[in-house]
Curated annotation (Swiss-Prot):
Organism (species): Vaccinia virus (strain Copenhagen) (VACV)
InterPro entries: Poxvirus_A26L
Short name of one Pfam family: Pox_A30L_A26L
Region of interest (Disordered), residue spans: 284-322
Full protein name: Putative A-type inclusion protein
Homology family: Belongs to the chordopoxvirinae A26 protein family.
Purpose of the protein: Encodes a truncated version of poxvirus A26 protein.
Transmembrane segments: none
Biological classification of the source: Viruses, Varidnaviria, Bamfordvirae, Nucleocytoviricota, Pokkesviricetes
Length: 322
């Protein structure tokens, strides 16, 4: 069995039959998870990850013999990147034709913006990989570019393909708000690609597209508006509390004043209470300024009352407002 290094270098492996077992397992997995909705905590199980891993490895092993005049002078793995070789790959052919082409038929009905179920997610990402096509339908590398010596061109093509794999999955993750669903891209899509830079760039592009454009920004503005509305309501409630406290103080003040000056010997005054004092006016006199001694309570009153000699600046006959 050829190892990955030999496959990469174009060393032709011993002819092997297509591993139909991995295709059968893949078909069963898709049927099993096709209607399973992706929730916030949904992830791909270890069993299903192993099946995906086997499918991609079997696809890589089955690449056809490369033409001597159709190899990359830059060492790029064109056997997995171009339609010229992928369409000759027996594993790819078998996968598309399996079960009367049911998998390929389902794949053609999907796009990155409508995926909501686990089976749809797995089928779409895996078929994009083994078909050598980006999510926008363009090939990883055009057949005419197989023998290109333009290093920048080939590197940019592969970087774009790698970005599309990350971009598509990040788009789904942000839309569904799930951070556990992910299928890693095969190693040949990382040819001359800086992984950390590519990941950060893809995340920035997704954030700019989704949050700077529509849904995230609208949700954020809505949340900010709700917070402001609640703050206004809280301030209004605080003002109400202050108002009721002032009213309570005023009522207690008036009650104490009239009770302490009452001639009814059986009327019980309020308990001792210290009133706010405002300079130069007494509410118990007809003078604009001055103070009045409050008469002591009736001797029949059992509870003592302290002298009240408020001095406030208000008109006579009218209590002060607090």
């Amino acid at each position: 069995m050829a190892n990955i290094i030999n496959l990469w270098n174009g060393i032709v492996p011993t002819v092997q039959d297509v591993n139909v077992a991995s295709i059968t397992a893949f078909k069963s997995m898709i049927d099993e998870t096709w209607d399973k909705k992706i929730e916030a905590n949904t992830c791909i199980s270890r069993k299903h990850r192993n099946i995906i891993h086997e499918v991609i490895r079997d696809f890589m092993k089955a690449y056809p013999k490369m033409d001597e005049n159709r190899k990359s002078p830059l060492g790029a793995p064109m056997q997995w990147l171009t339609q010229y070789y992928i369409l000759k790959n027996e594993y790819h052919k078998t996968m598309l034709a399996y079960d009367n082409g049911s998998l390929n038929t389902k794949f053609k009905t999907l796009n990155i913006y409508m995926i909501t179920n686990v089976g749809q997610y797995i089928l779409y990402i895996v078929f994009c990989i083994i078909s050598g096509k980006n999510h926008d339908g363009t090939p990883y590398i055009y057949d005419s570019e197989i023998t290109s010596n333009d290093k920048n061109l080939i590197n940019e093509r592969i970087k774009y393909a790698c970005k599309q794999i990350l971009h598509g999955q990040l788009t789904i993750a942000l839309r569904i708000r799930n951070k556990f669903m992910f299928i890693g891209s095969p190693m040949y899509l990382w040819f001359n690609v800086n992984g950390s830079q590519r990941r950060m760039k893809a995340e920035r592009e997704i954030a700019r597209k989704n949050c700077g454009g529509n849904p995230c920004e609208r949700e954020l503005k809505s949340e900010r508006s709700n917070v402001k509305r609640l703050e206004y309501q809280l301030d209004a409630e605080k003002e109400k509390v202050k108002f009721y406290k002032r009213e309570l103080e005023r009522d207690r003040y008036l009650s104490s004043r009239y009770l302490t000056s009452s001639s009814d010997p059986h009327e019980k005054p309020l308990p001792n209470y210290t009133f706010p004092r405002i300079k130069n006016v007494s509410p118990l006199t007809t003078e604009a300024t001055g103070s009045v001694e409050v008469a002591p309570p009736s001797t029949d009153v059992t509870e003592p009352i302290s002298d009240v000699t408020p001095s406030v600046d208000v008109e006579p006959e009218h209590p002060p407002a607090f």
